[in-house]
């Protein structure tokens, strides 16, 4: 019997994913229909997920049963008018083929521990939706296995306490520029927890809630679906065009894909300084705003505003969206700092969708969400990288490609660090000890 915060089948709708995945799917389908990609699961926290391998494989294989039905396609046509009729016709025939596209197994880390491995291979637009779904599956399976004793009342209590704090602080500090979207799908405690949380938010703070990044829940609760683009769009272009032009081409192609709609640029694939070098007057004018996802939000925002001003653009006409590991306290500090200087918005995920407060189990261990990502590792057989404005978020499997990428964008290359990284990579070669069934 499943606890109230869990359900027998985790993904029950093909729309139970992030909006930006379908946006990028259309762009990849249009511009790069034969491009091959590989994604890898990266577990950043200390959680050993290898015991879940069979359950993860089973849930991923169930994705083959999902379809875009007529009602869902009609909903997408209404709520996302930038999706073309041709693309929606393609979605009508779209199928997941997890047994051919996804390998689930175990590898041994450099420390000798076992860890879950999930690798996704295939044509870009045919595999792009797996990321959100795989992460949701892993998070819920882990919590169902080890944290099923957490009652729904704990989630309610944590949420109500947070919303009480928010209400109090907004009044005390007279903050009027705070609005946010819920973006917790990938790292949620469970589907039921995310649904419960959204139900609470729309009842308590409807005037502050802009929408959700989850298409299925947006449809169910009549909320606005929110989302634009992710790092993988820029990362893929590192393998699709000359690497020094990759960011510019990615920015231009995104505008072309949606005729200027969805004009929020993500700034930290290479890093904020490299981004601003490519974000010229034409692009800065065409894009409605930019999104922060790593590094200091205050330093970042100051740089963005100064850049707009240097181009003769009034920053108050542009939107700054913050999405990096936010809670309400941090978001309100950002609101105060940038009040009157630019339009501000927030995307908040784990803090709302996967926080159980100070809940501890009978062994005295406090609940913590998994820290994990599923990121593109290769495009057309070539490595790709995310450098980020926060070293812990940097990702690349090939140190030589990373050094070349940094050099091409005028970033400092630390040779001593590169040599040490090569030594570590040699020690940390992943060894498969269980292959896909």
Curated annotation (Swiss-Prot):
Catalytic reaction equation(s): nicotinate + 5-phospho-alpha-D-ribose 1-diphosphate + ATP + H2O = nicotinate beta-D-ribonucleotide + ADP + phosphate + diphosphate
Post-translation changes: Transiently phosphorylated on a His residue during the reaction cycle. Phosphorylation strongly increases the affinity for substrates and increases the rate of nicotinate D-ribonucleotide production. Dephosphorylation regenerates the low-affinity form of the enzyme, leading to product release.
UniProt cross-references to InterPro entries, sorted A to Z: N/Namide_PRibTrfase, NAPRTase_N, Nic_PRibTrfase, Nic_PRibTrfase-Fam, Nicotinate_pribotase-like_C
Annotated TM spans: none
SUPFAM superfamilies named in the record: Nicotinate/Quinolinate PRTase C-terminal domain-like (SSF51690), Nicotinate/Quinolinate PRTase N-terminal domain-like (SSF54675)
Any one Pfam family match given in the protein's UniProt record, by short name: NAPRTase_N
EC number(s) on file: 6.3.4.21
GO annotation (BP), single: NAD biosynthetic process via the salvage pathway
Keywords: Ligase, Phosphoprotein, Pyridine nucleotide biosynthesis
Recorded metabolic or biological pathway in which this protein acts: Cofactor biosynthesis; NAD(+) biosynthesis; nicotinate D-ribonucleotide from nicotinate: step 1/1
Cellular-component GO terms for this entry: cytosol
Secretion signal span: none
Modified-residue entries (Phosphohistidine), positions: 231
HAMAP family, A to Z: NAPRTase
Job of this protein: Catalyzes the synthesis of beta-nicotinate D-ribonucleotide from nicotinate and 5-phospho-D-ribose 1-phosphate at the expense of ATP.
Protein name as annotated: Nicotinate phosphoribosyltransferase
UniProt source species: Vibrio vulnificus (strain YJ016)
Lineage of the organism: Bacteria, Pseudomonadati, Pseudomonadota, Gammaproteobacteria, Vibrionales
Gene name in the database record: pncB
């Amino acid at each position: 019997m499943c606890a109230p915060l869990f359900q027998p089948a985790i993904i029950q709708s093909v729309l139970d994913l992030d909006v930006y995945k379908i946006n990028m799917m259309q762009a990849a389908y249009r511009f790069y229909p034969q491009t091959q990609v590989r994604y890898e699961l990266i577990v950043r926290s200390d959680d050993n997920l290898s015991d879940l391998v069979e359950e993860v494989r089973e849930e991923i294989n169930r994705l083959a049963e999902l379809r875009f039905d007529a009602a869902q396609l009609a909903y997408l046509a209404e709520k996302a008018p930038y999706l073309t009729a041709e693309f929606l016709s393609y979605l009508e025939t779209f199928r997941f083929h997890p047994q051919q596209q996804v390998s689930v197994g175990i590898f041994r880390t450099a420390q000798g521990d076992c860890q879950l491995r999930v690798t996704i291979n295939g044509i870009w637009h045919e595999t792009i939706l797996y990321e959100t779904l795989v992460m949701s599956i892993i998070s819920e399976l882990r919590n169902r296995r080890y944290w099923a004793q957490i009652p729904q009342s704990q989630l309610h209590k944590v949420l109500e306490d947070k919303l009480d704090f928010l209400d109090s602080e907004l009044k005390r500090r007279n903050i009027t520029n705070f609005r946010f979207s819920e973006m917790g799908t990938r790292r949620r405690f469970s589907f039921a927890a995310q649904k419960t949380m959204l139900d609470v938010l729309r009842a308590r703070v409807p005037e502050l809630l802009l929408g959700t990044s989850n298409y299925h829940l947006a449809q169910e609760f009549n909320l606005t679906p929110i989302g634009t683009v992710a790092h993988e769009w820029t990362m893929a272009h590192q393998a699709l065009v000359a690497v020094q032009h990759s960011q510019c081409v990615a920015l231009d192609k995104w505008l072309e894909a949606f005729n200027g709609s969805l004009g929020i640029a993500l700034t930290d694939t290479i890093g904020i300084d490299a981004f601003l070098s490519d974000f010229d007057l034409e692009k800065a004018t065409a894009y409605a705003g930019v999104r922060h996802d790593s590094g200091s939000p205050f330093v970042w925002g100051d740089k963005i505003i100064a850049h707009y001003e240097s181009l003769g653009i009034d920053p108050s006409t542009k939107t700054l969206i913050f999405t990096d590991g936010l809670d309400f306290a941090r978001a309100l500090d950002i609101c105060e700092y940038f009040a009157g200087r630019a339009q501000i918005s927030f995307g908040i995920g784990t803090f709302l969708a996967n926080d159980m407060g100070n809940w501890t189990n009978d062994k005295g261990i406090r609940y913590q969400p998994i820290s994990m990502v599923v990121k593109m590792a290769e495009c057309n057989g070539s490595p790709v990288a995310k450098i980020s404005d926060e070293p812990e978020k940097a990702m690349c499997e090939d140190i030589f490609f990373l050094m070349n990428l940094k050099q091409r964008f005028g970033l400092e290359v630390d040779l001593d660090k590169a040599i040490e990284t090569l030594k570590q990579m040699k020690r940390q070669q992943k060894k498969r000890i269980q292959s896909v069934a």
